[in-house]
Amino acid sequence: MEQTYQYAWIIPFIPLPVPILIGVGLLLFPTTTKNLRRIWAFPSILLLSIVMIFSINLSIQQIKRSPIYQYVWSWTINNDFSFEFGYLIDPLTSIMSMLITTVGIMVLVYSDNYMAHDQGYLRFFASMSFFSTSMLGLVTSSNLIQIYIFWELVGMCSYLLIGFWFTRPLAANACQKAFVTNRVGDFCLLLGILGFYWITGSFEFRDFFEILKNLIYNNEVNSSFLTLCASLLFTGAVAKSAQFPLHVWLPDAMEGPTPISALIHAATMVAAGIFLVARLLPLFIVIPYIMNFISLIGIITILLGATLALAQKDIKRGLAYSTMSQLGYMMLALGMGSYRSALFHLITHAYSKALLFLGSGSIIHSMETLVGYSPDKSQNMVLMGGLRKHIPSSQISFLLGTLSLCGIPPLACFWSKDEILNDSGFYSPIFAIIVWTAAGLTLFRHFCGNLLTFEGHLNVHFQNYSGNKNTPFYSISLWGKEGSKRINKNYRLFKMKNSQSSSFFSKKTYRSYENLKNGLRPFLNIVHFENKKSYSYPYESDNTMLFPLLVLGSFTLFIGSLGIPFNQELDVLTKWLTPSINLLHQKLNNSIDWYKFFEDSIFSVSIAYFGIFLASFLYKPIYSSFQNFDLTNSFLKIGPKRSISDKIINGLYNWSYNRAYIDTFYTTSLIETLRGLSLLARFFDRRAIDGITNGVGVLSFFLAEGIKYVGGGRISSYLFFYLSCLSIFLLGLYFSFSIVSIVIV
């Protein structure tokens, strides 16, 4: 066991050879590396699988013996300052490592086919492997400086991946928005780290917590300054985990490829903020008011995310706001001191949300066969509908993830979310009301999206918003820009024999132009079953994309059993978290009897089924899902005949669709203000600073011209004039000194 922990430092660096070798290959052998680009999926998955096996071994050791292992190397040592690097292996580290590796492997397998058509295939896998390295380095860090270094690397990787299709203006703006918003949080995090180092003189977590606890107990530190530093640390987590008010980057981050969205939302970037708060929870618990502040931010984020998701037509943006809301649940749980519940929900949400995002990628793939590479069309739920008949495997996986996030038993999120809902009732009745309301809205929104996508008819064949006949076939470039040429509507995109049928591992029927042109095939092939019956409709995804959905669906079904609370022997999660819970001085007895458990869960399940019923009633399939999406036709009414209730509903709809006008507020108050200040600075620079410089030059020019016209062009005259002036100056200077000496005498 000691050797397992001793070599744990290598965990973050195992995936690192992939981006290094890809970079060297592109530098030295660019043609060969590009021609053999598909082979890089295999080493990426293999190396991350090695990390997963290592993480599983560490997790088993911790569940059996519950140790916390820390190893430190001294970097610089003197009397006044010491800086150390090291790694810390505890339950939080092993949980995060398991999430990063398992979700990361599934995303890489999925991406091999999803990104096969893309010119940036090599860049994608290099960035993904470096992303995994950065996140693994973050969760194994033993001090705040290491965390900050890897924190910045995680932000850099997310910037590169969100803006992966950088030739699209929306993607370029989205990555800039994510970068700038996170710079605010990162700067606050750095200030908080420096502030606590000034207080404690240490960056190491264990020394840091112990010193601070003694200082607070002996009343040797200013509580206001302590609260300020803790708030600055928390602000870093707020930005990274998309909590209010620094959440604005998350929906726009959907401009990146769908596999990136799955990894960011499930196990990497947004999970980093939750990880930081969980890691620093022993610090926050002993500081007055900070726990209340954390729970307040969490509850606002829950409600805001649940309401803003209601009117989003983009399937990925709706999931993004859902992630924001679910992260709010975790933050609320940490603010209430429910450490176990927060991490439990982090685990269950990761697999459910990864399943939803990869399922949405399969849906988008099927829509792209009709509308081309245009996110405005392929991700628009208004143009979907009736896909259940065409992509049944993707529909089952998407429904499974939806039901899990809705809290339907016995799926994963039911067990974790129910704990947080019950804990909120003990913490604050007001918080409980808000949480239950937001839970109902979340259930309603998710099931509405499911109905819009899979039920009814394929709306892309019907009328568009303005009432004109929609022509779905366009020539779209690789980067999502719509071309001017329309494809013949009679062109059959798909041909399948009537003797084929659909199965979960159905053979891929959609292949992009690049694949056909270059003859490329997925490097990873999953054995498929032959189908006899065939149809002419949007194709089901390839087996390589369906296999991760199957695995994540299995996790969604069974991962909740990890923390079932009514049997202490079967409660693996509590055994796993025992060292961390002891560090927080919390009670270990989290088990309750069956009767109490079912009594607490009746209300949450009732709300879930009510939300499903309401969504089914309001979003029943009709000719156009656009009318359904606005809930009622009264949303579109104009004029004095509209009732007050219609105006209120329409106002709420606009508020949700326009993201509560928070982006507009930031644009007006910050961006426009900074732009005005920059214009003022430019005016001052050109008119004042440059004006003085240019004015001196112009004055010298005219003075020289005047002197030039005084002279006659003879050097002797110039020399006489110069000596005369010098004589007059010296004579005046002599008389001045004479007068001064007489006055003194």
UniProtKB/Swiss-Prot annotation:
One of its GO terms (molecular function) is quinone binding. It holds the Pfam family Proton_antipo_N. It is found in: Plastid, Chloroplast thylakoid membrane. Its EC number is 7.1.1.-. It is an enzyme of class 7 (translocase). Its main location: plastid. InterPro entries: NADH_UbQ_OxRdtase_chlpt_su5_C, NADHpl_OxRdtase_5_subgr, ND/Mrp_TM, NU5C-like, Proton_antipo_N. One of its GO terms (cellular component) is chloroplast thylakoid membrane. It comes from the Eukaryota. One of its GO terms (biological process) is ATP synthesis coupled electron transport. Keywords: Chloroplast, Membrane, NAD, NADP, Plastid, Plastoquinone, Quinone, Thylakoid, Translocase, Transmembrane, Transmembrane helix, Transport. It is a multi-pass membrane protein. The chain crosses the membrane at residues 9-29, 39-59, 89-109, 125-145, 147-167, 185-205, 230-250, 258-278, 283-303, 318-338, 396-416, 424-444, 546-566, 602-622, 725-745. It catalyses: a plastoquinone + NADH + (n+1) H(+)(in) = a plastoquinol + NAD(+) + n H(+)(out); a plastoquinone + NADPH + (n+1) H(+)(in) = a plastoquinol + NADP(+) + n H(+)(out). NDH shuttles electrons from NAD(P)H:plastoquinone, via FMN and iron-sulfur (Fe-S) centers, to quinones in the photosynthetic chain and possibly in a chloroplast respiratory chain. The immediate electron acceptor for the enzyme in this species is believed to be plastoquinone. Couples the redox reaction to proton translocation, and thus conserves the redox energy in a proton gradient. NDH is composed of at least 16 different subunits, 5 of which are encoded in the nucleus. Belongs to the complex I subunit 5 family. This is NAD(P)H-quinone oxidoreductase subunit 5, chloroplastic. It comes from Jasminum nudiflorum (Winter jasmine). The lineage of its organism: Eukaryota, Viridiplantae, Streptophyta, Embryophyta, Tracheophyta.
